[in-house]
Structure formats: structure tokens, C-alpha cells
A protein has these predicted regions:
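Glycine-rich oxoanion-binding loops at beta->alpha junctions
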Residues: 2-3
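Conserved catalytic-core segment of NTP-binding enzymes
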Residues: 6, 10-24, 29-113, 122
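Active-site donor-binding loop signature of nucleotide-sugar glycosyltransferases
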Residues: 116
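Conserved Rossmann-fold dehydrogenase catalytic segment
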Residues: 119
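C-terminal boundary of histidine-terminating zinc-finger modules
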Residues: 126-137
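Short, hydrophobic-biased amphipathic alpha-helical segments
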Residues: 135-146
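Short, hydrophobic alpha-helical segments
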Residues: 147-158
Length: 162
């Protein structure tokens, strides 16, 4: 937990947010670590929205449910809200059905649906992102579409808070 906050404080100290003026900052935390490390960006005021990426695998669904419950507990303290679920397909049986059921249980929705793609693993082998390796690929388009969906949710939340 302390390492995450130290990194965020260093970015702030260096003026990274003012210099780059990002629309969105993404913090990637392990789903099985719903503890201080997960909550620090929210408690420190570094997060307004939380988007949970999950597949339809049972352990991923379980971790996503735990994260959603933690976010729900924090929202009453004025911390971040759950922006939605992103389905990162692994092509397991009944995957979409399981994730939709999760969404019903946590009162959320799927805001993005990433297909399983060998393009991702091929890019990883090159130590690159898909957008770096193949910016015109179908998968790069999927990531751009997801970025637009995340921005739409964030902008709507911003309008509701104005």
C-alpha cells in the first residue's frame, strides 16, 4: 500500500499531472489484493472512478466481486465510485453470462468487452503494447473503443457532479 502512495506522491511532486494534463490515469492493481494497496489511490483522492477488468473465470469473478464490494464500502466516505466492469475475454464457458450475473449482483454494467486476441500475446513477446506494435490492428481499435467508453463514463460522472 505504501509503495503505491509513494509512487503517486512522486508523480504529484514532479508535476506530472500538470505537465501532461491527462484525461485519465490508470492504476493497475492485482485483483487478489483488496487491501491497503488497492484502497490507497481512492483514500488519497487519486481516483474518482474505478473500472474493474475481469474475465469469466471463477477466480477473476470472485476478485472482481471483492473489489466492487470494497469500492461500494468506500463510496459512503466520498471516495471513488464504481464506473463499470470491463470484460476481458478468456473464452471460457458461459463467460458473458457469468460477468452479466456479476454486474447484476453488484448493481453495475459491462462498459467494455475486449475479445481474446493473439495480437496481445504477440505484442507482449515483443515487449510492446498492441498500440505500439500494431496501431492499425483490430485489437488496437478495440482498445481505442474501450478508451472512449471509459471517457464517456467519466465525463458523465463529471457532469453529474457539476
Amino acid at each position: 500500500g505504501r509503495g503505491i502512495i509513494a509512487a503517486l506522491e512522486k508523480l504529484k511532486e514532479k508535476g506530472a499531472y500538470e505537465m501532461y494534463r491527462p484525461d485519465v490515469v490508470i492504476y493497475d492493481v492485482l485483483g487478489d489484493v483488496v487491501c491497503g494497496g488497492f484502497s490507497m489511490p481512492m483514500r488519497g483522492g487519486y481516483a474518482d472512478q474505478v473500472f474493474v477488468l475481469t474475465s469469466g473465470e471463477n477466480m477473476a469473478i470472485h476478485a472482481a466481486a471483492n473489489i466492487a464490494m470494497a469500492v461500494d464500502n468506500f463510496k459512503n466516505r466520498g471516495y471513488a465510485k464504481l464506473g463499470g466492469i470491463i470484460l476481458n475475454r478468456r473464452n471460457v464457458k458461459h463467460e458473458e453470462e457469468k460477468v452479466r450475473e456479476l454486474c447484476e449482483d453488484i448493481h453495475s454494467r459491462i462498459i467494455g468487452d475486449l475479445p481474446r486476441s493473439e495480437t496481445v500475446t504477440d505484442a507482449e513477446e515483443l515487449a510492446m503494447t498492441v498500440l505500439e506494435a500494431w496501431p492499425d490492428s483490430e485489437m488496437a481499435g478495440e482498445y481505442r473503443k474501450l478508451a472512449g467508453q471509459i471517457l464517456a463514463v467519466c465525463r458523465k460522472q463529471g457532469e453529474n457532479n457539476a
